[in-house]
C-alpha cells in the first residue's frame, strides 16, 4: 500500500497537471469505489467544480474544489491515478473517471478494487481521528515523546496505527526501526529517552529521503510522472535472507500484528521484559536463542559481524527478490501503457 512518500509524490505530480481545470462530468465504473455516496450524487456534486488544489493528509490525497467541497482519494493496495486525453485507450481496471474541460480526464485505476474516493463539504472532517504529520514542523520530539509515553503497545503495530502518527506503513516502519536499532516487538514503555529521540529522527529522515526519491515503486505503486527509486535504497524491507547492511547477519522475516516484518535480530536487540506476552512468545519460538536476543560477538564465527560477500543462500534470496522487483516493474509499465499514460 502506498505510504506517505508515495502519496506525496502522486500529489506533487498531480497538482500541476490538474490545478485550475474544471470537472465537467464523472463516470463511475465500480460503485463501491465511492465512499458513502451514489455515482449519481457524486457526479452531480463534482460537475462544474474547479480544482483549486491538491494536497495530502496521511495516506490520502485531497483534491480541493471550488465552493468549499473536496475529494479524498485513498489508493489502498493497487490504486493508481493517470491524467490522459479523453480519447486514450480503454482499460477494464479503470474504476472512476473525472472528465476535465480541456479534453483530458483523470483516471482512477485499481485492479483489486480496494481504493476509495469520497466527496465532502467544508464542514466535514474525515481526518479527525488521524494522528500528526511526521514531516510537519509541529511534529517535534516533545510531541512524539508525549504520544509515545501514552501508549503501551509494541513498536511495529504502534507505528502502523494511523491515529498515532499519519502516513507510516509497513515499508517505512521496518526501515525506521532498523535505522534506530529498535526491535519491532519492543514495547513503547521500555524505550529510554535516547531511544525515543533516535526513532523520531529516523522516522523523519527516512520519510524525507523517500519523498526526495519519489517513494518506493514496489508491487503496483507508480505516480503520474513515473516510478520512484527508494526501493533501491531500502535496508531491510523485503530483504529476508540478505545480509544486514550493518552487521552482515541475515535479515529475518516474521509476522507481527498480521503484517510481514523485516529486521536484524543481532542489531535490533529485544529486552528480556518484552519477550513474553502479547504474542511475542509465539513469534520468538520460531527463532533460535541468539536470534531472539541478538548474537554476542563471542558467538559469531570468525569473520562474521561485518558486511562482506554474500553467502550462497543469501545470493539466492537476493536473486529471488530482484526477480520479484522486476516483475512488479513490468506490471507498472503495463498499467501506464494500458491507459495511454
Language-model regions, residue ranges each:
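Compositionally biased, low-complexity segments
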Residues: 294, 311-315, 334
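Phosphate/anion-contacting hairpin/loop surfaces
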Residues: 71-182, 187-190, 194, 199
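Gly/Gly-Pro- and Ser/Thr-rich, intrinsically disordered tail segments characteristic of DNA damage-repair
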Residues: 1-117, 138, 239, 288, ...
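Generic alpha-helix initiation/capping and coil-helix boundary signal
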Residues: 166, 196, 310, 320-322, ...
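Intrinsic disorder/low-complexity detector
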Residues: 76, 97, 176, 264, ...
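Basic, nucleic-acid-binding surfaces and adjacent catalytic neighborhoods in DNA/RNA-processing proteins
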Residues: 23-42, 55, 60, 147-303, ...
Amino acid at each position: 500500500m502506498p505510504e506517505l512518500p508515495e502519496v506525496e509524490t502522486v500529489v506533487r505530480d498531480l497538482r500541476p497537471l490538474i490545478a485550475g481545470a474544471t470537472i465537467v462530468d464523472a463516470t463511475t465504473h465500480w460503485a463501491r469505489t465511492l465512499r458513502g455516496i451514489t455515482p449519481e450524487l457524486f457526479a452531480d456534486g463534482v460537475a462544474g467544480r474547479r480544482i483549486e488544489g491538491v494536497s495530502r493528509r496521511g495516506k490520502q490525497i485531497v483534491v480541493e474544489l471550488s465552493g468549499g467541497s473536496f475529494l479524498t482519494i485513498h489508493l489502498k493496495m493497487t490504486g493508481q491515478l493517470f491524467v490522459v486525453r479523453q480519447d486514450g485507450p480503454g482499460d477494464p481496471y479503470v474504476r472512476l473517471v473525472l472528465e476535465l474541460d480541456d479534453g483530458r480526464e483523470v483516471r482512477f485505476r485499481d485492479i483489486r478494487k480496494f481504493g476509495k474516493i469520497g466527496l465532502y463539504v467544508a464542514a466535514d472532517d474525515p481526518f479527525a481521528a488521524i494522528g500528526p504529520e511526521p514531516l510537519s514542523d509541529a511534529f517535534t520530539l516533545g510531541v512524539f515523546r508525549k504520544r509515545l509515553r501514552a501508549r503501551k503497545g509494541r513498536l511495529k503495530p504502534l507505528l502502523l496505527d494511523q491515529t498515532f502518527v499519519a502516513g507510516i506503513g509497513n515499508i517505512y516502519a521496518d526501515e525506521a526501526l532498523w535505522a534506530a536499532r529498535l526491535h519491532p516487538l519492543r514495547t513503547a514503555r521500555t524505550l529510554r529517552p535516547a531511544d525515543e529521540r533516535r526513532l523520531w529522527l529516523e522516522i523523519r529522515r527516512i520519510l524525507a529521503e523517500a519523498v526526495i526519491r519519489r517513494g518506493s515503486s514496489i508491487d503496483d505503486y507508480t505516480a503520474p510522472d513515473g516510478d520512484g527509486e527508494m526501493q533501491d535504497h531500502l535496508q531491510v524491507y523485503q530483504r529476508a535472507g540478505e545480509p544486514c547492511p550493518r552487521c552482515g547477519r541475515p535479515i529475518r522475516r516474521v509476522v507481527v500484528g498480521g503484517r510481514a516484518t523485516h529486521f536484524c535480530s543481532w542489531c535490533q536487540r529485544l529486552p528480556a521484559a518484552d519477550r513474553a506476552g502479547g504474542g511475542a512468545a509465539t513469534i520468538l519460538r520460531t527463532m533460535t536463542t541468539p536470534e531472539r536476543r541478538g548474537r554476542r560477538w563471542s558467538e559469531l564465527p570468525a569473520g562474521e559481524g561485518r558486511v562482506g560477500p554474500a553467502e550462497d543462500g543469501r545470493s539466492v534470496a537476493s536473486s529471488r527478490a530482484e526477480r520479484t522487483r522486476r516483475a512488479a516493474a513490468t506490471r507498472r509499465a503495463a498499467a501506464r501503457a494500458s491507459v495511454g499514460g
